[in-house]
Amino acid sequence: RAVGVATALVSDTGVEDYVAAIAADYQHVRDVREGKGQSALLSLADARANAFVADMSDKPMPPEQPGLHVFDDWDLADLAEVIDWTPFFRAWELAGNFPAILTDEVVGESATALWADAQAMLKRIIDEKWFTARGVVGLWPCRREGDDVIVHVPLHPEQMPAFAGEEWTARTHGVTASLPGDQFGLDGDFHHVRLPFLRQQIAKREGRANMCLADFIDHDGDWIGGFAVGIHGLEPHLERFRADKDDYSDILAKALADRFAEAFAERLHRHVRTTLWGYAPGEQLTNEALIREEYRGIRPAPGYPACPEHSLKQILFDLLDAGNSAGLTLTENFAMLPTAAVSGFYFGHPDSQYFGVARVGEEQLQDYAVRRGVDTDTARRWLRPNLD
């Protein structure tokens, strides 16, 4: 698509028609949006009164191995086994599910040629070790406080044997003071870090809850996890392709790095469920079942529908010490570097599920700013895509 766009923009004869077509498309989008109107919003109090109620008698057990776990060089061949190829083809604007897309009457020939090229490069990536897969997992005690989850991070690593690094610094994330853990049924001294989540406010049909991720955490004590993974080593190969003016290989390598990052997130989540947290030790799922998410628990990512506010990545990265643990950093707008990276939270309750927060109102915006510890203008900028 990028090649076609660039060609149209540099064309002496086609650029005006192309720009006019784009303008017409966007005007159509505006007209449709204005015609549809917007769904009614509940007050924040009413939305909270209609919260999802999870059965806390079925909450997950404490982790077998709490704390931080660092993975410096996960086997690329292992990750290749769980790659979900359907999004790979969509990235090339080839519509269809893998492997059926390879025999599709319309795009099958193009998809098959692309698949062959991808497999050839994939083999080189693994054999020549182009990439290094680095990641970190954290599993912490926590509790729910309204629409927030308060994460308890030990002040001293020896309180949680798997916890890595020196004394952890809470920074400024709407954190309470460092308090004795016994206030929350914990041994030792802990930082208490606030994770503010957003609640659905759009009026629902009877029997449908206005959900928030905090609904899956017990007020009386629970556990939450976090992770961040990244694929390192891509850039030198991109430089080589650019020097050779090989745009195709450049794009192909980027697409495969993204697939490795997603596969790493999938593989690590399974390791958490079966071993580190261990609430599903006997899990035996096929790759297809993993893609369909037929497992217990979710891993919502900041910036995605259930957790749309990107700045929570900064709290997550600080909790994980992601820079030192996995070589991952954030830009000022909370984009992850390297770009082939995935991060998110782990919820283990069997009732936990994905949903979209969608539109929220001014009342929740102001409430969120207080809970997040920022001024309203900053919160408004962060939440703009979800505002009324």
Predicted regions and their residues:
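Active-site loops and adjacent core secondary-structure elements that bind or stabilize anionic groups
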Residues: 3-251, 255, 274-276, 285
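C-terminal accessory domains/tails appended to large, multi-domain proteins
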Residues: 168, 186, 205-388
